[in-house]
């Protein structure tokens, strides 16, 4: 009998081959593959070829292959592949000192960070995957999941939505009953039910899959489907679509899921799994174009039907325990996740967001202001005037209101900033798309010190925040409607001289960064 791991591996390879680059057209004069479907940043191509040797082999034979220069770098690897040597990984974190709560040496600290928040995280999800419903013959179904059902893969999946139990809840736990989800395979029910320790709407797929059943019929072959979905389908349970911090936990985990499945194809369906009758407000919907060529489907579109999915993925979730990046317990004093840098590059490439060529030797300072009631900068005009008096600064003030400024335009402004300044708030999630040499300056963290510091560490860019408590001036003590006094619920003024000192400190960092296109010495600034 073929080992279970090999069965799973062969299926994943099949998933990649069939859907990533299309079928070969080996007639001597035509391209052997449609390489345009790969659609990755040029720097990512060697890593893709390492994991897809069948594409590399065809590229070697193909006179029309645009990636021949990358065939010299096939040792390059993301880090989670079994054939990956440590020295050829996409990147490796930097640790400035030891966090003795996690490690005893710098080297051990780097390993901890890499496992927590880099491609080591992908490696651990792959290693813990087990088959819960085993196919016995060609055409059978399969269910394979990581621990606690945080991520699953299914083939020939049967989903009976003829009796939808929809209401106002987004994630109703008894939405599916026995016999309404499953496949034709040998189910280890005990193993499946043992994975419920982390049962929670945005932490696990246990509520949705606990009733997975083993059927005597083959759903597709035996004509038990009203609809058959041929394309690979990614099921996602989404966090708040009106908050960039929370929604980008969805997108980051979708990108990680692509790595787990070794497929970056956009020829996929994405189904929003919700048991609610309502729609989903999404202020960042342009981002989906980086992952799919099609509109997002609401699960209720399949109501009153039996639907069969040939290939289905239950994506990693936005608020998983020890997940990325909402609940990440991150070791201190380390920074620079290759995974987050790759995510940033991937999304920017797919959305066609580029660096504008410099027209003058200035550091681009962008100040993000808030049109909400709280956390406004009371003396904004004074601060801007002080910055504009510095000849080497090019200053832009923006308010990322979605009705005024589209998200792609927002990303372009962010990506073309060298110093990005803003009050504590979800808008600072834009730091994910700053260039590598940039500084994010959280003007005041409102006593929430870790949130954007840790996100900046993950992205690998320099983080700053206000340092002197006697030089920031709150309007009042804050007035949360339920919690009472709270620093996030007031507005602030800042000492102009201290503000300018900090921005100039950030400018020095930018000017000395090896990747800054207009690198200057401190004296020139």
UniProtKB/Swiss-Prot annotation:
Report one GO cellular component.
Answer: endoplasmic reticulum lumen
Keywords noted in UniProt? Endoplasmic reticulum, Glycoprotein, Glycosyltransferase, Signal, Transferase
A biological process from GO: protein O-GlcNAcylation via threonine
GO MF term set = protein O-acetylglucosaminyltransferase activity
Q: What InterPro entries does the record tag this protein with?
A: Glyco_transf_61_cat, Glycosyltransferase_61
Q: Which reaction does it catalyse?
A: L-seryl-[protein] + UDP-N-acetyl-alpha-D-glucosamine = 3-O-(N-acetyl-beta-D-glucosaminyl)-L-seryl-[protein] + UDP + H(+); L-threonyl-[protein] + UDP-N-acetyl-alpha-D-glucosamine = 3-O-(N-acetyl-beta-D-glucosaminyl)-L-threonyl-[protein] + UDP + H(+)
Where are the glycosylation sites? 352
Renumbered to this chain, motif Prevents secretion from ER spans 522-525
Signal sequence region: 1-24
Keyword field contains Amino-acid biosynthesis: no
Q: Does the keyword Glycosyltransferase apply?
A: yes
* Primary location group: endoplasmic reticulum
Give the protein's biological function. Catalyzes the transfer of a single N-acetylglucosamine from UDP-GlcNAc to a serine or threonine residue in extracellular proteins resulting in their modification with a beta-linked N-acetylglucosamine (O-GlcNAc). Specifically glycosylates the Thr residue located between the fifth and sixth conserved cysteines of folded EGF-like domains.
Q: What is this protein called?
A: EGF domain-specific O-linked N-acetylglucosamine transferase
The species is Xenopus laevis
